[in-house]
A protein has these predicted regions:
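Conserved helix-loop functional segments at active or binding sites
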Residues: 43, 67, 173-177
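Conserved, charged catalytic cores of large soluble enzymes
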Residues: 28, 32-42, 60-143
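Hydrophobic alpha-helical scaffolding
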Residues: 20-27, 47-51, 108-113, 154, ...
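Flexible, glycine/charged-enriched surface loops at secondary-structure junctions
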Residues: 2-5, 44-56, 65-76
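A structural-propensity feature for long, helix-poor, extended segments
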Residues: 2-48
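Sparse, context-dependent recognition of short Cys/His-centered cofactor- or disulfide-binding micro-motifs
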Residues: 15, 46, 60, 121, ...
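Function-dense linear segments that define catalytic or interfacial modules
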Residues: 1-19, 126-178
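Conserved structured core elements
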Residues: 24-35, 51-55, 59, 116-120, ...
């Protein structure tokens, strides 16, 4: 029952969700996300969605998931045609109307060792984008440690298999009777 209520958009904004202590955002974030998703889909009526469109779609959905921030990871292979745009996706996102892009941790995956010039370029991009993104992931090393790796949890602390589940959780000890 408590889990269904936490995911229910029908709770009034500001209502405390039983069993969790979270505060409901109401249906406002869902309404806003659906309008933006419709605009995004309509803008691509005559063409395929880009990877950046999919990033926006994923992050817009992420804004509706719960009454507190949800985390996603977005991964892009280094050298991809959209990698530069991806690397800068969060730049000024809180002032340019794309605040939903703040939902994901964006990382570039390297399957071969990058050159010093590539790393310098990546660090310059990180600095230009605000200082923290994109992250970069050494997929060769990850596959040595976990040959089945297909992705990672949002902060890239865990290697995950395809459709794998992150097992990190948070316990609020004050909610347990002593």
């Amino acid at each position: 029952r408590g889990h269904a209520r936490a995911a229910h958009a029908g709770e009034a904004a500001g209502a405390r969700l039983g069993g969790y202590g979270w505060i409901s955002s109401g249906d406002g974030p869902l309404h806003e996300a659906l309008l933006k998703i419709c605009d995004l889909m309509n803008s691509r009526i005559d063409s395929l969605m880009t990877r950046i469109d999919i990033l926006d779609l994923m992050n817009l959905l992420g804004t509706t998931l719960s009454s507190r921030r949800s985390d996603q990871i977005a991964l892009m292979p280094a050298g991809d045609i959209e990698a530069d745009e991806f690397a800068m996706a969060k730049k000024d996102c809180f002032t340019n109307g794309k605040h939903h892009r703040g939902q994901s941790n964006n990382s570039v995956m390297f399957s071969v060792k990058p050159s010093v010039a590539e790393l310098r370029g990546l660090f310059a991009t990180m600095e230009d984008a605000g200082g923290s993104e994109p992250g970069f992931i050494n997929m060769t090393s990850a596959k040595v440690r976990a040959p089945w790796v297909s992705g990672f949890n949002p902060c890239a602390e865990q290697c995950l298999a395809n459709k794998g589940v992150c097992n990190l959780s948070e316990l609020v000890l004050t909610r347990f009777p002593t």
